[in-house]
Amino acid sequence: MPDINELLRWSIANSTAPDTDASEQLQIRFNPNSTQSGTSTLHASDSGPPDISPASTPGPVTPDDGSSLPLPPGTEVPVTKKEDLTTEMLDLILGKGDSITMKEKMAFATDENNSVEDRVEALDDFEMLIELIDNANNMPILKLWDPLLTLLSSSHPEIVAHTCWIIGTAIQNNIKAQAAFYIHETFSRILEIIYPPSSISSYPPSVRAKATYALSAALKHWPLASYALYTATSSAENGYSVLRRGVNDPQAIVRRKMAFLVGTLAMQSGERYEGEIPSEVRNYIEENEKNAPSESLVEGLKREGVFTALVDGLKQGVDDVEYEENAMRALVRAHQKGGLTVSEKSDLKTIWEKWGKQGRQERGLDGEDGKEVSETLSS
């Protein structure tokens, strides 16, 4: 690819009009804009000094008829060879289109002959591109979902983590990309990264956290979230049971995200998607709704014991204020939608009172948020 100096040389060599030959380029024309001389005197009646201005500067005796000063005899006129503007030069000037760059980055990332570090860098670049919703929606057209999903089976944890990160970014708050995610049957594969089958070693916390991020993005605002959790199977577990395990996961980064996700699902339970739905996505949703259970998200979470597991986690006192904040918020939302039993509500109220003013402040639940919790648990 040409460097910037080569590009500048090309632009200079090709910047003249095509009908001007080299000799004309070196001739200098003078067209004074006024009859005013190029020198000045103290009084208007004084005569000006002799013209000693160079040829390039208009003076009193400079030709004013537009004639040219020819080159001295024997002067050789250099011939400039013009070059065609190449694709590489255009790429350097304008930059490659995102679609081309996305395909190149994915091809590089899936090539195992490249180093893991370089492949991860390519995935980083790809993730930045699909932050734009149009690029994320173009992934099916560019046939990039299939090669991306092959990376979920990589033996390198950092490759798997970045793949989950890309998936989460692509589908977050993007119903069209969410549909592509489910069409490619990716949901169960994400669950298996969070809780692999017994025959597969567990992934590091950083990988499982990225997979939980992708799980959250797949469910948030998705009209068929309850259906996805009910039907998806991973190691003989459905999505609801993965959430139940997740809220008490031994790894703090995972259980915090799981508790937050449960709160998000409780909040969106019973709500209808209000955004615009493309026709192809609407057709997919309507077709799958025929087989979907009638239960809401809160009903499914309650049936599977997810709320009970969260209450148990708070009762155990894991010394993790971020987790406890997320769990309390999730359970309050669940109670507001009828998701807690009388016993669970009583246990939650006891925990809330035990925290006291200082404990609530430590967990970010003072002020208006704390007032809402107190009122909800007292109702």
Swiss-Prot record:
One of its GO terms (molecular function) is adenyl-nucleotide exchange factor activity. The keyword Transmembrane does not apply. It comes from the Eukaryota. Keywords: Cytoplasm, Repeat, Translation regulation. It is found in: Cytoplasm. ARM repeats lie at residues 25-114, 133-172, 175-220. Residues 29-44 have a biased composition (Polar residues). Residues 29-80, 359-379 are annotated as: Disordered. InterPro entries: ARM-like, ARM-type_fold, Hsp70_NEF-Inhibitors, Nucleotide_exch_fac_Fes1. Gene3D superfamilies: Leucine-rich Repeat Variant. The keyword Amino-acid biosynthesis does not apply. Functions as a nucleotide exchange factor (NEF) for Hsp70 chaperones which accelerates the release of ADP. Required for fully efficient Hsp70-mediated folding of proteins. Belongs to the FES1 family. This is Hsp70 nucleotide exchange factor FES1. It comes from Cryptococcus neoformans var. neoformans serotype D (strain JEC21 / ATCC MYA-565) (Filobasidiella neoformans). The lineage of its organism: Eukaryota, Fungi, Dikarya, Basidiomycota, Agaricomycotina.
